[in-house]
Regions:
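ATP/NTP-dependent adenylation/nucleotidyl-transfer catalytic domains that generate, transfer
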Residues: 17, 187-339, 387-388, 393-418
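Short linker/helix segments within small regulatory modules
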Residues: 186-189, 363-378
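Iron-sulfur cluster-binding cysteine motifs and their immediate structural context
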Residues: 352-368, 380-397
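Short cysteine clusters
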Residues: 103-104, 194-197, 347-353, 357, ...
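ATP-dependent adenylation/nucleotidyltransferase module used to activate substrates
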Residues: 1-176, 364, 403-418
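Immediate flanking context of iron-sulfur cluster ligation sites
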Residues: 177-191, 341, 347, 369
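A broadly conserved sequence feature marking short terminus-proximal activation segments
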Residues: 137, 145-165, 300-355
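A short secondary-structure junction signal
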Residues: 139-145, 169-174, 182, 186, ...
Length: 418
């Protein structure tokens, strides 16, 4: 408790804007919250629950209980949630996978960042999260420090008060202090995260399905929907889902969700074709530079130079062309330029780019994208691979058409779990 208080005092002097307990409803976060509320004044920190919409039903009971407890103790409790339901995002991104785990960014990280911005009124806030991470949980976590600077989001600190605790110490503390314990654990579950997770062990999946069959099967149905039509028979699809083959997905080749983006080279030009783009490219182009002309051929001034390109719009089809010589001479510009049109094609305004922007330049209110003049062209909204999580999730391997449903995998191991 003393270490928590000393860390709070030290980092408050360093300019941390907001301290908060990253609350998940699990046993570790319940203990962490109890330690923090004993160590710090109740008006000096917040409790933040990232609601993915895929939590165990017992977790929601836990969160409701803790929220009432916080209200009684005058501790600010914040629920952060994506504007999209999991059923909506799974249908647009395809089911998450071990490598392609877009769900954490869309349903957890981005909503939390946006909620803290709203709570603090600061776009580029510095936060410190008290997290219930323990070194004994995994090899990776055994290398964590008590306090570390987050890699995922600039300027966000993590403090791990129970890093050196083992499970026995954790449960002993819970029962000795009469803390609320998520009922998921008493039913045999070792974890209380998302019901269906590509990183979950087979044992975890078994208990989750036994305990919460209705909610679990709803998510499994979403996985089936994403792959229907790809398998020769229902039996093969059943085997694929049951064996966890969906967890091994690395791209969009096997999904029945088609991309509206095509890229090719014709007559020494890079050609990009987008059918029914979801967002306005003239908004996204602002993130890489300043558009200097109002009609095609366009010129964009960037930190890599000034470049000319053409855009044709007809019957819902956007055709972009750029001299192939630029592709070879300005690879850094080309990466960002392609990202602009990846976003144009498939952005659903999931909020990740908005959260990544520390200048508050990206706005996505009421389903409309707007990028204002505070944009510094820092490229933080392009840090996601390929510039867009939807594009990355649905992208086909080179040589496989994104518009063709009939492409099948030749990899006999592609339907098995990692």
């Amino acid at each position: 408790i003393k270490q928590i208080y000393n860390s709070f005092v030290k980092y408050r002097k360093k300019g941390v804007d907001v301290f908060y307990v990253a609350f998940s409803g699990g046993k570790d976060s319940v203990v962490t919250l109890d330690l923090v509320q004993k160590a710090l004044p109740h008006n000096s920190f917040k409790v933040l629950f990232g609601d993915t919409g895929m939590e165990f039903p017992d977790t929601y009971e836990t969160v409701d209980y803790i929220e009432k407890q916080c209200q009684r103790d005058n501790i600010a409790f914040i629920r952060a949630k994506s504007k999209y339901k999991p059923s909506e995002t799974w249908a647009k991104f395809g089911p998450p996978a071990t490598v392609n785990r877009w769900c954490c960014s869309v349903h957890k990280t981005a909503p939390q960042i946006l909620a803290l911005r709203e709570a603090t009124g600061i776009h580029d806030f510095t936060g410190m999260a008290f997290i219930g991470v323990r070194a004994s949980e995994s090899v990776a976590r055994s290398g964590y420090d008590y306090i570390s600077l987050g890699e995922k989001h600039k300027g966000q600190w993590s403090c791990n008060p129970i890093l050196d605790w083992n499970s026995a110490e954790l449960y002993a503390y819970i029962y000795s202090e009469n803390l609320y314990l998520n009922k998921a654990y008493t039913k045999g579950n070792r974890r209380a995260g998302c019901l269906v997770c590509p990183r979950a062990a087979e044992r975890s999946d078994y208990f989750a399905r036994k305990c919460y069959p209705k909610e679990f099967d709803q998510l499994i149905s979403a996985i089936r929907s994403g792959y229907e039509g790809h398998f020769a028979s229902e039996a093969n699809l059943d085997q694929f889902v049951t064996n966890g083959g969906w967890k091994a997905r690395k791209n969009g080749r096997d999904l029945n969700i088609l991309s509206n983006y095509e890229e090719m080279e014709e007559s020494r030009k890079l050609i990009i074709k987008i059918t029914n783009p979801r967002t306005d490219w003239k908004q996204w182009i602002k993130t890489i530079g300043i558009l200097q002309s109002e009609a095609s051929p366009y010129c964009v001034e960037t930190k890599h130079g000034i470049f000319e390109f053409e855009v044709e719009e007809s019957d819902g089809i956007l055709k972009i062309s750029l001299d192939s010589a630029i592709v070879k001479s300005a690879p850094n510009f080309i990466k960002l330029f392609k990202n602009v049109f990846h976003k144009t094609a498939l952005c659903i305004r999931c909020g990740v780019c908005e959260a990544d922007c520390h200048n508050g330049a990206i706005h996505m209110e009421n389903g409309v994208l707007r990028i204002d003049d505070t944009c510094k062209h820092c490229s933080m909204c392009h840090k996601v691979e390929r510039g867009c999580l939807v594009f990355k999730s649905l992208e086909r391997p080179k040589g496989v058409s994104s518009m063709n449903k009939k492409n099948k995998s030749l990899n006999c191991y592609s339907h098995h779990a990692p």
